[in-house]
Amino acid sequence: MLGAFEGSNMIAQEVTVRIADTNWESIKLARMDNIPTYYGNPMSEHAGRTVDLSLYGTVLVISPYKQLNPLVTYHFEHELGKGAALGLSVNDSQKRASHQVSESYASKLCLFNEDMTYAKLAGYTSKGGKIKTTRLSDEFSYEDYEIEYQQRSIVLCAIEPNGKVRMFTSLKNIQPKSDWRIISLITENKKTDYIVFDKNSLNPST
């Protein structure tokens, strides 16, 4: 996973991951939570020698580093295979003609849902969002789950009984079944509007 912030650290507490970032403060927070990390450029030769990619099937590009994200995406798709690197949507300003991303790259920006940007995700966690794992059952189906949490959650991934992790994206229609676990970012409020940070306030280290 490229990008360490409160939300990614919470995801890592539920799913086996390694977080990579060039921001030492973010890496330090992840290490305090005993999450495996890589401090530095994940595309570097050093990363290639020290990180065993065979342990990971998917790379999630969850970072504000807009110039680095496409490079990371294509690098790991080359290493792991087509569709193995997923990123967040771009913001409205990037959709102008002068900032238009390529159709090929845009097709990979589908993580969680079609309009989930880094700023929205970070804003959601700043409003008290917490990671919650819910096990489905015959008595509490995914339809029941959506009714209960839809207005105050972002569904992140589902874990099958055999341990397989399936990420929610705008391109795949996952139909979770009984005994699956759903991992979501949920707020206490019954309905939560996104807080959107100004990109300058995120102040990532590059």
Q: Language-model features: where?
A:
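Cytosolic regulatory regions of ion transport systems
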Residues: M1-T206
